[in-house]
Amino acid sequence: MRFVALLLLTAAALGTAATPMLAVRGPQRVQVTALEFEYRLSRLSVRQGPALIELVNYGEDEHNLVLRRVGGTKRWRIAKILPGSHATLALRLRPGLYRLQCMVADHSARGMRATLRVRR
């Protein structure tokens, strides 16, 4: 009986040892809600790597989104979307601070901007 119990424990241990321990992570998601004259981010901080930035327009005007890493020159854009619409941007984020702005008319000057922190 002891031999059977030992055999079962050994088989169970071997079965779990063969199972990969690394979890595959998909892209992180950040929803940017556009209102009259503010952005609300679903999260203020994400890990570096693949990300999906979704702009959802709950406002009454058209809005867009321009994303730029502080100290960087590259810009990512979501074109103007109508009220009630949404659009998604897929990108790979490096550590640092990213500024988000609505570049429609004077929206950014009126407060339609936010900051996203990307950590290691």
Where are these regions (language model features)?
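Surface-exposed, proline-enriched loop/turn segments that connect beta strands in immunoglobulin-like
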Residues: 40-42, 76
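Beta-strand cores of secreted/periplasmic/IMS beta-sandwich domains, seen most often
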Residues: 42-61, 87-101
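Solvent-exposed strand-loop boundary residues in beta-sheet-rich modules
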Residues: 69-71, 108
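Bacterial N-terminal signal peptides
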Residues: 5-15
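Beta-strand signatures of extracellular beta-sandwich domains
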Residues: 64-68
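Short loop/turn segments at connectors of secondary-structure elements within structured domains
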Residues: 26, 49, 59-63, 110-112
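Extracellular/periplasmic metallocenter environments
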Residues: 19-25, 29-33, 38, 81-120
